[in-house]
Every structure is written in structure tokens, then in C-alpha cells.
Regions:
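Catalytic cores of Mg2+-dependent Asp-rich isoprenoid enzymes
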Residues: 12-117, 124, 129-303
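Single conserved hydrophobic/aromatic residue that forms the stacking wall/gate
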Residues: 1-10
Length: 303
């Protein structure tokens, strides 16, 4: 049983998707009004957003990303794809940072960029799965540059050198953002650093698995073995001690995440303790939100 940012959502047919999203927004209204519905998850969310000072814009942006999925939106450029990834994953990075009492603009930027990098990895991994469901997230301009007509390919998705080149390019962009994001680890509370660094290492390793399969994510779905995950988490448990701070730690935010950073960089509430367990809990969100999103259905339990 996995946790989720919206544990009160389950899944149902796409014809109800827009109504479900509208209902989620109403529930968000109630949460921020301090009158959550009589649902455990709503009450828990109300506690977190008020106790941790989480701006509503972050959750609204996440729902916007779900709405873009409901529309079947495609992305012309990598910058457009950054905008999507900022909403469905950068928002989670920002909220994690706030839960861990890290509210400076620079570390928030790195947290959002980590979310974007993870989402790009998800997209590179799931090219075939998405295509068979009628979804295409690879930048359309990159496909054309590789000699691929996006509409024709989506109608009959096959692996070839052009797709391999686009997947490699997307992984390179994810890796660039992983390197930037790692610089934000040093700004986190010490007991949170191993978990965040471990998540960064495990997600980046998905890219290495894709490369090991010849970049064929049309016919195969790359998986990091449990043994390898444990090794990477063990590495993270000590590697965080060696994470330094360089110029990238203070680099300007990726343009697509600036609105998130601007919303989240605010005075901190009263200090809190005991964040490690909560951090590990929240680390599951990116993968869970991605899995929920890919079903293309959202169900709201309003009872």
C-alpha cells in the first residue's frame, strides 16, 4: 500500500475526470478555509498546510498538472515540458522542502528542480507505456529533429535510432538537473539529507538502466533492482556528509519553477522537530503521483 499526496483519491473512468478535479478544488477550498471535510485525509492535509505554511498555489499547480493530463496536452519544447514537470513533480519538491523547514529561495529552487528531473526520468522510462495509452510527453520539436513525425509515431509506436536519440537527450537533461539539485541537500536538516540524496541517486539510476537496455523504453520498462536500491541508499547514508556547496547551489531557478519558488519562499512558522519519518513518507509522493496520473482517471470519495 503506497501513500499519496491525495490519499483520498482513487481512480475511475476518464469521462468523470474533469468533474473529479473540480471536486478536488472544492475540497482544497475547505482545507484552506480551515473547515476540511470529515475525511481523515482532508483533515491531515489541513493540519500540514497550516502547520507547515504550505501556500495554496503549490497544490493548485499540482492539480493544474493533472488537468493538463486530462486534456491530453503535448509539449512542443523542452521548456514546455519543464512547465508540466514543474506542476506534477516540482510542486512536490517544494512542499517537501517546506515540511523540512527549508524555505530559502535557493534550496527551494533545487528541490523543485529535483522534482522536475525525476519527472523527466519517468517520461524517459515510460515512452512505450505512454504511447500505447495514447500519450506522448517527449518534446515534439526533438522528435521532428530526429526525423520522426509525432502523430504518425504515436499511431504506431516503434523503437528506432530516432527515439533512442530523443530518450538519451531527455536523460541528459534530467542528469543536468540532478547535479544542480544535489547542491540543495546541504541546506536540509541533517536527518533529512540521506533520504533525499538516496531518492536522487535511485531515480538517476533509472536512467542508467535505460541506457543499459540500449535506450529502448518503448519495448522495455527499466527497473532498479531492490538490491541496487539498497546499495544506493547505503551510499547516500554517508555521501551526504561530502555534499558541498558550489556556485550551482545559488544558481537562478529553472524558469519553469520560479513561480513555485516565489510562492514558497516565505517566513517560516514556529520550529518543529521529528521530521525524518515524515520525510521518508513524503519521498514516496513523486512515484505515487506519477502512478496515479498515468491511469488517466481520478475519483473523489466525497463521503
Amino acid at each position: 500500500q503506497r501513500s499519496t499526496l491525495f490519499p483520498y483519491t482513487t481512480l475511475f473512468r476518464s469521462r468523470d475526470r474533469h468533474g473529479a478535479l473540480a471536486n478536488l478544488r472544492l475540497r482544497l477550498d475547505a482545507v484552506y478555509a480551515g473547515r476540511p471535510r470529515a475525511i481523515v485525509a482532508d483533515r491531515a492535509l489541513a493540519y500540514v498546510v497550516h502547520h507547515c505554511g504550505i501556500p495554496r498555489l503549490l497544490l493548485e499547480a499540482l492539480l493544474d498538472g493533472f488537468a493538463w493530463d486530462a486534456e491530453g496536452r503535448q509539449y512542443e519544447t523542452i521548456e514546455d515540458l519543464h512547465g508540466y514537470a514543474a506542476r506534477v513533480a516540482g510542486t512536490v519538491g517544494a512542499m517537501m522542502s517546506l515540511v523540512m523547514d527549508t524555505r530559502g529561495a535557493a534550496p527551494l529552487a533545487r528541490a523543485c528542480e529535483l522534482g522536475v528531473a525525476m519527472q523527466l526520468t519517468n517520461i524517459a522510462r515510460d515512452v512505450g507505456e505512454d504511447a500505447r495509452a495514447g500519450r506522448l510527453y517527449l518534446p515534439l520539436a526533438w522528435l521532428r529533429e530526429a526525423g520522426i513525425d509525432p502523430a504518425a509515431w504515436l499511431a504506431a509506436p516503434v523503437f528506432g535510432p530516432g527515439i533512442a536519440a530523443v530518450v538519451q537527450r531527455l536523460l541528459a537533461e534530467a542528469d543536468r538537473l540532478y547535479v544542480r539539485a544535489e547542491q540543495g541537500v546541504a541546506a536540509l536538516p541533517r536527518d533529512c539529507r540521506p533520504a533525499i540524496l538516496g531518492a536522487r541517486l535511485v531515480y538517476a539510476e533509472i536512467g542508467r538502466e535505460i541506457e543499459a537496455s540500449g535506450l529502448d523504453s518503448v519495448n522495455r520498462r527499466a527497473v532498479v533492482s531492490d538490491r541496487r536500491k539498497l546499495a544506493l541508499m547505503a551510499r547516500a547514508s554517508t555521501a551526504w556528509l561530502r555534499v558541498g556547496v558550489d556556485a550551482q547551489a545559488r544558481a537562478p531557478a529553472l524558469p519553469a519553477v520560479r513561480f513555485l519558488v516565489d510562492a514558497a519562499a516565505m517566513p517560516a512558522p514556529e520550529p518543529r522537530r521529528g521530521f525524518y519519518a515524515r520525510t521518508v513518507h513524503i519521498l514516496e509522493l513523486l512515484e505515487t503521483v506519477e502512478q496515479r496520473r498515468r491511469t488517466q482517471t481520478v475519483h473523489v470519495n466525497s463521503h
